[in-house]
């Protein structure tokens, strides 16, 4: 029996009634992947911030950026949406590292514009290509009243970023570890974890060892609902990316169909990984 097709068919069956289009990429970081629409292009929404973080650490490694340098929130960088910097006001000064951390963990849009200005949009795109993500582009800073598109990527590119973080090969071992620590603090992972057994995730309440943790970055705009990252299990890590488009409901809420069906697929993959002791398939 073709086990790969069996798993893909199970995912397809789960998505049969979904009124949208979902692409899936899963890598067990051993020798197997699941790929459904892996090379389709998607609006990135805030998932582009993961690529920007990688570029920042690349530039730090070259001495062209400094995590301890202070940068200033300027009026031109204001944008609505997620984040905390709106509460601080124009003129606030933050270290580059703290700004980048806010860009990821609470998906701060103003912090993102600050880092884009710090690095330069053209430099960001050149470095994204240099890092090997050939189908990923940052089109514009975050200004929703001026631009319809933020970025473009594919599930394969996004999965490759997290696979390199997990393996310690994105920029360097030290940079990968630093980025992993930031991704682990990211607040918004409902699509990946909503259907996980909460016992696995809540070691602070249960007092048990942390069995499962997530290092991820999600992104949502009218045109997309995306999530992707590293899932740690007792058997090791795997990478999962779920990207959604062509749905009808543009309102953002946790029970959005893309979130509901994404969570079902994510749980299906988790169960498969646990049943196969860290692999996608028993061979």
Question: What is the role of each PLM region?
Answer:
Residues 54-62, 117, 160-167, 267-274:
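Short glycine/serine- and small hydrophobic-enriched flexible loop segments
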Residues 62-88:
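Short, glycine/proline-biased beta-turn/loop segments that scaffold the active-site neighborhood
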């Amino acid at each position: 029996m073709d086990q790969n097709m069996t798993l893909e068919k199970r995912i397809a069956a789960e998505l049969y009634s979904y009124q949208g289009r979902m692409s899936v990429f899963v890598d067990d970081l051993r020798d197997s992947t699941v790929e459904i629409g892996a090379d389709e292009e998607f609006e990135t929404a805030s998932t582009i911030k993961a690529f920007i973080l990688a570029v920042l650490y690349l530039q730090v490694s070259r001495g062209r950026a400094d995590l301890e340098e202070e940068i200033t929130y300027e009026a031109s960088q204001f944008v609505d949406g997620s984040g905390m910097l709106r509460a601080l006001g124009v003129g606030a000064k933050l270290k580059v590292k703290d700004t980048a951390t806010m860009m990821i963990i609470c998906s701060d849009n103003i912090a993102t514009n600050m880092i884009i200005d710090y690095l330069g949009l053209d430099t960001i795109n050149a470095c994204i290509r240099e890092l090997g993500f050939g189908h990923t582009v940052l089109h514009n800073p975050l200004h929703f009243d001026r631009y319809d598109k933020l970025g473009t990527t594919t599930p394969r590119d996004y999965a490759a970023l997290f696979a390199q973080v997990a393996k310690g090969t994105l920029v360097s071992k030290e940079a990968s570890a630093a980025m992993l620590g930031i991704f682990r603090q990211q607040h918004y992972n409902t699509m990946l974890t909503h259907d996980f057994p909460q016992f696995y995730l809540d070691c602070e309440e249960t007092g048990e060892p942390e069995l499962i943790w997530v290092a991820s970055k999600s992104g949502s705009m009218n045109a997309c609902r995306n999530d992707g990252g590293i899932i740690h299990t007792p058997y090791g890590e795997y990478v999962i990316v779920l990207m959604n488009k062509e749905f009808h409901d543009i309102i953002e809420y946790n029970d959005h169909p893309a979130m509901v069906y994404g969570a079902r697929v994510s749980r299906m993959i988790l169960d498969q990984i646990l049943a196969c002791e860290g692999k996608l398939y028993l061979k």
